[in-house]
Amino acid sequence: MGRVISSWRVLAVVAALMAMAAVELCAAIPFDERDLESDEALWDLYERWQEHHHVPRHHGEKHRRFGAFKDNVRYIHEHNKRGGRGYRLRLNRFGDMGREEFRATFAGSHANDLRRDGLAAPPLPGFMYEGVRDLPRAVDWRRKGAVTGVKDQGKCGSCWAFSTVVSVEGINAIRTGRLVSLSEQELIDCDTADNSGCQGGLMENAFEYIKHSGGITTESAYPYRAANGTCDAVRARRAPLVVIDGHQNVPANSEAALAKAVANQPVSVAIDAGDQSFQFYSDGVFAGDCGTDLDHGVAVVGYGETNDGTEYWIVKNSWGTAWGEGGYIRMQRDSGYDGGLCGIAMEASYPVKFSPNRVTPRRALGAKETQ
């Protein structure tokens, strides 16, 4: 695997991770049992929360959402008070959203529905990492300079695009030695044959779009807007373009196979992120109650082990740096569940890249390139 980018850039990445942890702590709003003693105290906490997170609510909406806020605050308090679960929760910017609203707004890949409809693009045959042996005990592609900063999808169900981009950014850095931030908005606007922008999509389909359209452009050339738009062919054709040769799927329901892939590159995965404990995750190794309704696309960028021997996946999310551990979550590895915790090993895939990147614009967006 070796060095991906120069040492000074790796140091910059480590410094950025430390800065994100500081941002995460500042983003939390503390409360204690006195804030739960009465509805009046909870209402005061609710108003402090709105001011802290800059969440404007008109009077009628505040009253409508207050019930969800109370339930969430009590849930967070009881979880942290019990302790012993290896992870903590905190009152973040999602504080007055009920579970169904949260799932519909921020966990919108609709992966299960799209696969049931037979809309997943076919992968390249085989699993190129099948023969990998003697895996390192820990891998962190952030520290190898293959992961860009945490991004924020906003109120757009574009998690699939962010998951795709993390994996493509990673393999591009590994193959070329250059870390380049790529455009999620191009995928939202232009990859519309089988994906649906802010209404959901599949990472496999996005990989195939990138392959057949001759690459994906940079974030600076085609910046994120958190909304569906018309494909801007002028922006999308701007060079340089990062090229891939397709994608492969990780053998389903095998965390061992997933580890082989992650040891070699960041991997896109679909998970069930609709649980209340996932919504308010703060820090530690997450081992919450979640099913396998795969509704959210994220990327595994490493794995490791705590001092007490708990194994975990390092997962990059797209809900900004104020959520979780600076925008990341450590999820329990080898949990004993079929498909892994929250289904993390059920639908994993990664881009394959051997071809050089383009230094000239594409001919016409959407026209398939000859291979």
Curated annotation (Swiss-Prot):
Keywords: Disulfide bond, Glycoprotein, Hydrolase, Protease, Signal, Thiol protease, Vacuole. Induction: Induced by treatment with gibberellin (GA3). Induced during senescence and pathogen-induced cell death. Cysteine endopeptidase that digests in vitro both the acidic and basic subunits of glutelin, the major seed storage protein of rice. Acts as a negative regulator of cell death. Optimum pH is 4.5-6.0. One of its GO terms (cellular component) is lysosome. Plants silencinge REP1 develop early senescence at varying levels and show enhanced cell death when inoculated with the bacterial pathogen Xanthomonas oryzae pv oryzae. This is Cysteine endopeptidase Rep1. Glycans are attached at residue 228. One of its GO terms (biological process) is proteolysis involved in protein catabolic process. Expressed in germinating seeds. One of its GO terms (molecular function) is cysteine-type endopeptidase activity. Belongs to the peptidase C1 family. It holds the Pfam family Inhibitor_I29. It is found in: Protein storage vacuole. SUPFAM superfamilies: Cysteine proteinases (SSF54001). Residues 29-133 form a propeptide. The active site is at residues 159, 296, 317. It is an enzyme of class 3 (hydrolase). Disulfide bonds join 156-198, 190-231, 290-342.
